[in-house]
Amino acid sequence: MAGVSVIPVQSKRDMKTFVDFPWELYRDDPFWIPPVKSQVIQLLTPGRHPFWTFSRRELFLAMRGSEVVGRIAAIVDGHYNEYQQEEMGVWGFFECLHDPEAAGALFAKAIDWVRQQGMEFIRGPLNPSMNYESGLLVHGFESRPTFLMTYNPPYYPELVKLSGFRKEKDLLTYLSNRDTKPPEWAMNLGERLAQKQEVKVRRMNPKHFDDEVRLLTRLYVECWGDNWGFSPPTASEVRDMVNSIYPIMDLDLAFFLYVQDEPMGVCVVLPDVTPLLKRFNGKLGLGALIKKHLYWNEINGCRGFILGVKEEYRQVGAPLVALHYLLEAAKNKPQYYYVELGWNLEDNQAINLLYEESGLRPHKRYRIYRRDLA
């Protein structure tokens, strides 16, 4: 058997190989969801995605002879490091055959690259940051992921541990469906709190796109600013994100919450379009998928993509009010049988307990790993 070599991605052909590799790796896996290829290329390309205005990266391929056996991205997120006053390197976009030698060579190359950039530790998988798809699936392999959540083979956690990484944080998702019966006390309390605080709900207005993006950016920082691993996305990143998902957004499930005309929370629930991504195998962008009306009956669920409440409203029941509105809005859409919420940090006990007491059940668990470089 030929040995493993790791090479940097330098040409368009190399980039195509890097992007295409998961299609080979997962070709017999019924739960893998192909991403939209054009969006993957955009996300990975400096000059085409706003993330790279403040960050840098190197892409690598692992070869065994002439066969591609794995890939990885080594990243320095300059915005995060400035915001958190840390020297963090990142690994992401990792895919590999069940080949410990190849995985070890990829991680060694990523570690060496971020060390040369002056980083003190490396964290991952982040694709390319916590504001995007993050975490390695460690529990919940028996079903497909929802839209914009990661997926990987069950052997990945062992490959990561063999390269000297330790668990740093777990991310949790929760599931509700039409058979879920939230306790009556929770629903009644949510209604009473909404009335007492005079909570108002306003749907996002696409006619005022720039204003809505600015408000979403502001609330994202105010709602999540104290979270572990957080760095605020730039307005350009938020605008790019909204532009990318807008074709499939259900505007009945995208709203801001107000108390006395002060915005206090935001919720965006997206149709789980993974059946269509699977059907069209990454060849169609989201704008093209929306035109495939014949197949939209295959979409029977949704994902709580964004659900946040400002800190000063959390102790007066606002998270329960937001959850109440979300679940009721989804329930009023007969095409949606289930809604997945998350991810949540494992130690966000208040929100995780709220979900469980409201009848939601734990669904999937994702893990962020760390290795110190000193």
Predicted feature descriptions by range:
Residues 1-31, 37, 374:
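Generic start-of-chain signal for non-secretory N-termini
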Residues 82-164, 280-357:
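Acyl-donor binding region in acyl/amide transferases
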Residues 22-65, 72-82, 208-308:
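A conserved beta-strand-loop-helix scaffold within acyl/acetyltransferase catalytic domains
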Residues 15, 78-81, 130-132, 181, ...:
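Flexible loop/turn segments at secondary-structure boundaries
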Residues 76-79, 278, 307, 353-359, ...:
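Alpha-helical subdomain
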Residues 2-4, 150-229:
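Acyltransferase donor/substrate-recognition loop-hinge adjacent to the catalytic core
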